[in-house]
Amino acid sequence: MSERIDQSVPDAARVGVVSRIGGVAGLPADDQPPIPTRRRQSFRRWFADKGWRHVVAWIAIAFALFPLLYIVSASLNPIGTLTGSNQLFSAISPRNYERLFTDPAIPYGTWYVNSLIIAIVTSVVTVLLCALGAYAFSRMRFRGRRFGLMTLLVLQMFPQLLAITAIFLLMIQISDVFPAIGLGTHAGLIMVYLGGALGVNTFLMYGFFNTVPSAIDEAAKIDGAGHARVFFTIMLPLVTPILIVVGLLTFIGIIGEFAIASVILTDPATQTVAIGLFQLVSGFQSQNWGVFSAGAILAALPVMVLFLLSQRYIAGGLVSGSVK
């Protein structure tokens, strides 16, 4: 006959059930095991371990925020001078912002629209042309392919500003033959910007295209799809992060560009925000830093909005595009 199994609840002291106050139920207070306590770390050890990182982070944040606070304070200060803006937010008035759109001597609205048109058109065309070039280098095999890639790398070493004199002389010659894309036109400036942006961005996209498995487009070609269909319907959706990154970086670089735009755009009606704001503070007796600060803040708004909307694509696009 089998032994009867005891199904009663075991004694708490026998199994060592831990009570809510940290002791063992059923044991005398003197026999309770000691409760482990966390040893307090000294300030010197904490600072050597991780505290210095907090200090460096706060210094970096202060270093980045102070210029922003200063320019916001200057834009709200009706005095319009740098000496009057030494004390942050000592006076607050929307007068500088009103002057940007009410003063006939400051066509800020025209400058703003010109900058947006040039930046948007250049960004869109740059993304399209760079994507086409990157797809060709990544998926096609043709004579001169390696030489073309090396040329793109070499072109990245020379900034576009080095050729500003040659660009000016070339645009004068183009104006005699094709006035629509010559000196003083938006189309001419866009062409100059495209020439400087295609090299580095094509190579950046080329690295991202290489991360897409070639079996995907090969399967589409077996089903009868051509290069155009593979590119527009399959590849472009897969490389969306790098397209957004290239478009955003191009837009940021152009919306505030001054040196080349000041050489190409000689007509005041075609000038951009960067040129117009420079004119506000270039005069010896007519400097108005308050209006300049207000215009600079408004010019930065599109960049901030685009960056916030596309920030989740930036890290992935840059990391994947940097790997060949």
Predicted features along the sequence, with ranges:
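Transmembrane alpha-helical segments of polytopic membrane transport and secretion proteins
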Residues: 1-57, 286-289, 311-324
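A structural signal for multi-pass alpha-helical bundles of membrane permease subunits
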Residues: 53-324
